[in-house]
Curated annotation (Swiss-Prot):
PROSITE patterns: HELICASE_ATP_BIND_1, HELICASE_CTER
UniProt enzyme class: hydrolase
Protein name, UniProt field: RNA polymerase-associated protein RapA
UniProt GO MF annotations: ATP binding; DNA binding; helicase activity; hydrolase activity, acting on acid anhydrides
Gene3D superfamilies: 2.30.30.140, 2.30.30.930, 3.30.360.80, 6.10.140.1500, 6.10.140.2230, P-loop containing nucleotide triphosphate hydrolases (3.40.50.300), Tandem AAA-ATPase domain (3.40.50.10810)
Cross-referenced HAMAP family: Helicase_RapA
Assembly with partners or alone: Interacts with the RNAP. Has a higher affinity for the core RNAP than for the holoenzyme. Its ATPase activity is stimulated by binding to RNAP.
UniProt feature coiled coil, ranges: none
The family this protein is said to belong to: Belongs to the SNF2/RAD54 helicase family. RapA subfamily.
Domain named Helicase ATP-binding: residues: 163-332
InterPro entries hit by this protein: Helicase_ATP-bd, Helicase_C-like, Helicase_RapA, P-loop_NTPase, RapA_C, SNF2-like_sf, SNF2/RAD54-like_C, SNF2_N
UniProt motif DEAH box: location: 278-281
Length: 968
């Protein structure tokens, strides 16, 4: 295409960007700026999805200054069109270079296509209209961002995501207990922030071992393609940009990478919108000597507007550590540790009042006094009288309790900054049962251990303990590859018998090392032909998906999945309830992570944990410490990290040297400290915080709405028709799933996001949750969004001609169906779509210009129509032109009335909602310092911006259908 600087083009795929200007032509690329949204797009000159905008004599064009020009002629100079005509305000003869056209101009292209005989198939018009309706429905939903992720509809998770994800630059601490889904909550918030335009650039910082887990979670659950950055990736990225972090929008990296000053400086300069830090409780801090890791996150949190910290429960690592994390979120608010402790003491009165309100009994005097003092600026006596009165309707009393609870939540505690759910407050978890199976130590292992003892004097205590826990690895090191430990290890014999006696059960087996997992698979296959598959860190994501799918398959699938420690990260298998621990990890957190593969919300059965171990070895001693000291097999142990830190040296000594007295002493001390920590945590429970974190009835209402949307058969039918029109091959696979593949006859050359070898999808959430290799299709899924964009961003379905066979009407009767879009060009981040979403406006005119759309609905009218071929349709349009021209003007009049009303309603809704929220936050700021000034300033600016965008809203003709009555 011939491009020149200053020319005006419109994007065929993103028409909402408005009129674009060519700002750079270099080599094979052209860059177009879209001033209406402030966005740049770079295209290949040869294949740019752009249409040149040139007006004709008779057209009216608008300058960027607001005045119009009635075009009489046009000339061209250096590739730039110059329009000549009459100035609308002065009446003078003037010229206007195309570069100075108003960038908010919209184009009624369907009219031009109709009169040029470019007529689409009838079904494409219908699909286009449905696509616009789907876009409107999605944009106007207050649950935008929650429907699409492949996650269970868990109330507390959806509540936190709904509350936090809607905020501008949220800065919160997610501190749920293990197994309650902090990663999912963070993913939901990220998904919402991206989909709503509140964030575009996101940096996730995780420990080295969790980078892959986050990559998998973000892709498989949220359809978000993050890039993992390490030193090698940074070096490679220099070819594209001086700052490697600018080469991707969504980045995962480790703290280790950012410890390097050069990389940290680059990250600080990369203009992120949201920072997410996992395992934030490992950021060590003291007032005198904060750790390097803490300083890295602190520096980033000072320049990045939004911050999510994922951490262990606040009680787990002590108050000072908890304060340090809150300080990262708001250093002005949490500036002094002593002041923080004093404030925490005052929360006890709040907790007492909250506990009383959350119950059903009458309020004790102490609670009433606390409430009166805490809510001093509000007269609460009417609510108190309702709660205390006899014979009052239970719903009325509950409403009064809820109102006072909400007042407490708004005004006290860290509810806007901290979310923490515990298993005590969230129901739905299975029970855990521990089964241990002792076996004698084989002679071969004893010999290998003796030889190693003579040779390994230089090894560290931890290395010796790890060696003692994995005798099979030690044996294999001393023997050549022809020796196979699994031929004599009694644990393998037990495993084979166990699987044979539980043939109908799915069994997850976890071992520390990938080599162990591979050997076990070989043993099961060669000795008994048991169907098992492996899952380890040496496999690609696709290979792991296939292994997981093979295991999940009910018929013909693997009975057992054998995972390595690292390989199992980020994968959950709730459909299985038997877990075999072939060995034990040294760290209690890793043990909980193993059990957590099955022990999640959504697990429908009790979990049976099986441990085959070698008697009188380090394996037995570690098992006793976990079971008798921490009760870590049958209950989650939030204090496991603290206990391991305190007793690590004693534990390692006991594992390396068999001393029964030392073991007994260690178990007694561990039990005592475990009970002490458990009691402290129970005492420290903040009832108000728990109520705010799990959301109660409001959370249930959100989940019910999402569940209703899941069963929307209209959506399923619309999406299937969309894929049919585009030409995507669809093969029914059974199990509520279909395979989508690109075909040779697709309407578009490519379908972004649809792999060449296809993808298996389902509309059923339960099916998607049980199968990692099946994508969950909702209106938010990229394959649906891309399909909608392909249709609505192209000319597909913009014109159509149809026949209405109805003898009750005279033959030749003409109807003109016009679909307009009420829209305004605005950046996603403005949130304009919440008040004025892209809205299709249907006008159905008879030949006299009467609008029949209120009397004749779209669906019933569409069913009566028959298609005509393009050639005949063109002739019918040509013959009807004298009637059609005045009807277009009439249709625009009707649609403009609707748009004006919609804009007025949008302005009223926006002003009402934002003013109310601003007023609420301003009044709360006086009593709750957790309200940030940045949030208030954002709301004030947003109101001004939205009014400007609403003023610029316009009407755009999107599609035309001409209908003629025939009796033939």
């Amino acid at each position: 295409m011939p491009f020149a600087l200053g020319q005006r083009w419109i994007s065929d795929t993103e028409s909402e960007l408005g009129l674009g200007t060519v700002v750079q032509v270099e080599g094979r690329m052209v860059t177009v700026l879209f001033p209406a949204t402030g966005e740049n797009r770079m295209f290949s000159r040869a294949e740019a999805p752009l249409t040149r905008v040139i007006y004709n004599p008779g057209d009216s064009v608008e300058s960027h200054e607001g005045w119009s020009l009635a075009v009489s002629e046009l000339t061209e100079k250096d590739g730039i069109v110059i329009y000549h005509g009459i100035h609308s305000e002065t009446g003078e003869q003037v010229t206007l270079r195309e570069t100075l056209l108003n960038h908010n101009i919209r184009f009624n292209k369907p009219q031009d296509r109709l009169f040029a005989g470019q007529i689409d198939r009838l079904d494409r018009f219908g699909v286009r209209y449905q696509c616009q309706m789907l876009r409107h429905k999605l944009a106007s939903s207050d649950l935008l961002g929650l429907q699409g992720p492949r996650v269970g509809l868990i109330p507390h998770q959806m509540w936190i995501a709904h509350e936090v994800g809607r905020r501008y630059a949220p800065r919160v601490l997610l501190a749920d207990e293990v197994g309650l889904g902090k990663t999912i909550e963070a993913g939901l918030i990220i998904h919402q922030q991206l989909l709503t335009g509140r964030a575009e650039r996101i940096l996730i910082i995780v420990p080295d071992t969790l980078r892959h887990q986050w990559l998998v979670e973000m892709l498989r659950r949220f359809n978000l393609r993050f890039s993992v950055f390490d030193e090698d990736r940074c070096v490679e990225a220099y070819a594209d940009h001086d700052n490697p972090f600018y080469t991707e929008q969504l980045v995962i990296c480790s703290l280790e990478l950012l410890r390097k000053k050069k990389r940290l400086d680059q990250a600080l300069d990369a203009d992120w919108d949201l920072l997410v830090v996992d395992e934030a409780h490992h950021l060590e801090w003291t007032e005198e000597a904060p750790s390097r890791a803490y300083q890295v996150v602190e520096a980033l949190s000072e320049v990045i507007p939004g911050v999510l910290l994922l951490t262990a429960t606040p009680d787990q690592l002590g108050h000072e550590s908890h304060f340090a994390r809150l300080r990262l979120l708001d250093p002005d608010r949490f500036y002094d540790y002593d002041a923080f402790l004093a404030e925490e003491d005052s929360y006890k009165d709040v907790a007492i009042a909250a506990e009383a309100l959350a119950g059903n009994a009458k309020l004790p005097d102490a609670a009433i006094n606390s409430l009166t003092e805490l809510l001093g600026e509000k007269d609460i006596s009417p609510s108190i009288r309702l709660i205390q009165a006899e014979g009052i309707d239970a719903e009325v009393q509950q409403a009064a309790r809820s109102e006072l609870l909400q007042e407490l939540l708004d005004r006290h505690g860290t509810g806007r900054v901290l979310y923490r759910n515990s298993r005590a407050s969230v129901k739905g978890f299975p029970k855990r049962f521990f089964n241990a199976y002792p076996h004698a130590m084989p002679d071969q292992y004893q010999t290998a251990a003796r030889v190693s003892g003579m040779m390994g004097g230089h090894k560290s205590l931890e290395a010796k303990a790890a060696q003692a826990l994995s005798p099979e690895k030690l044996y294999q090191e001393f023997e050549d590859n022809s020796a196979s430990w699994w031929k004599f290890d009694p644990r393998v014999d037990w495993l084979i018998e166990f699987l044979k006696s539980h043939r109908s059960k799915k069994v997850l087996i976890i071992a520390s090392q990938a080599e162990t997992a591979l050997s076990l698979e070989e043993a099961l296959r060669t000795r008994e032909g048991i169907q098992a598959t492996v899952f380890h860190e040496g496999m690609s994501i696709i290979e792991r998906d296939k292994a997981g799918a093979y295991f999940a398959q009910e018929e013909g699938g693997a009975q057992a999945l054998i995972c390595s420690e690292i390989g199992s990260e980020g994968r959950n298998f709730q459909f299985a309830s038997h877990l075999v621990l072939f060995d034990l990890p040294l760290n209690p957190d890793l043990l909980e992570q193993r059990i957590g593969r099955l022990d999640r919300i959504g697990q429908k059965n009790d979990i049976q944990i099986h441990l085959p171990y070698l008697e009188d070895t380090a394996q037995e001693r570690l098992m006793k410490w976990y079971h008798q000291g921490l009760n870590a097999f049958e209950l989650t142990c939030p204090s496991g990290h603290v206990l391991y830190s305190e007793f690590a040296e004693d534990l390692l000594n006991v594992l390396v040297v068999d001393d029964s007295d030392e073991l007994t002493n260690l178990l007694n001390h561990t039990q005592s400290r475990y009970k002490e920590l458990k009691h402290t945590m129970e005492q420290g429970r903040d009832k108000l915080l728990e109520i705010n974190s799990h959301g109660g009835e409001k959370a249930m209402a959100i989940v019910q709405r999402l569940a209703q949307n899941d069963g929307d058969t209209h959506l399923i039918g619309s999406v299937i028709r969309l894929w049919d029109i585009i030409g995507v091959d669809q093969e029914d696979k059974g199990e509520n799933s279909i395979i989508l593949r690109p075909s040779e006859h697709m309407m578009f050359p490519t379908y972004p996001g649809l792999p060449e070898d296809g993808v298996t999808v389902t509309f059923d959430r339960d099916t998607a949750l049980s199968r990692d290799d099946i994508a969950l299709i909702t209106q938010e899924h990229p394959l649906v969004q891309t399909g909608l964009d392909l249709i609505t961003g192209s000319e597909t379905g913009t014109t159509s001609v149809a026949i209405l066979k109805n003898k009750a009407l005279p033959a030749g009767t003409l109807f003109l169906e016009l679909i307009y879009m009420a829209d305004a060009s605005a950046p996603k981040s403005s949130q304009l779509y919440r008040y004025l979403p892209p809205t299709p406006i249907r006008v159905l005119l008879d030949k006299n210009g009467n609008d029949l759309s209120a009397k004749v609905d779209y669906a019933s009218f569409d069913k009566q129509l028959s298609a005509v071929n393009r050639h005949i349709g063109g002739k019918l349009v040509t013959a009807s032109q004298p009637i059609l021209h005045p009807l277009f003007a009439k249709g625009e009049e009707y649609a403009q009335v609707v748009v004006d009303e919609m804009v007025a309603q949008a302005r009223e809704k926006m002003t009402q909602q934002l003013s109310a929220e601003l007023s609420r936050l301003e009044s709360l700021k006086a009593v709750n310092p957790n309200i940030r000034e940045e949030e208030l300033e954002y709301l004030r600016n947003q109101m001004q911006e939205l009014n400007t965008y609403l003023d610029a809203s316009q009407l755009q003709l999107d599609a035309i259908r001409m209908v003629l009555v025939s009796h033939v």
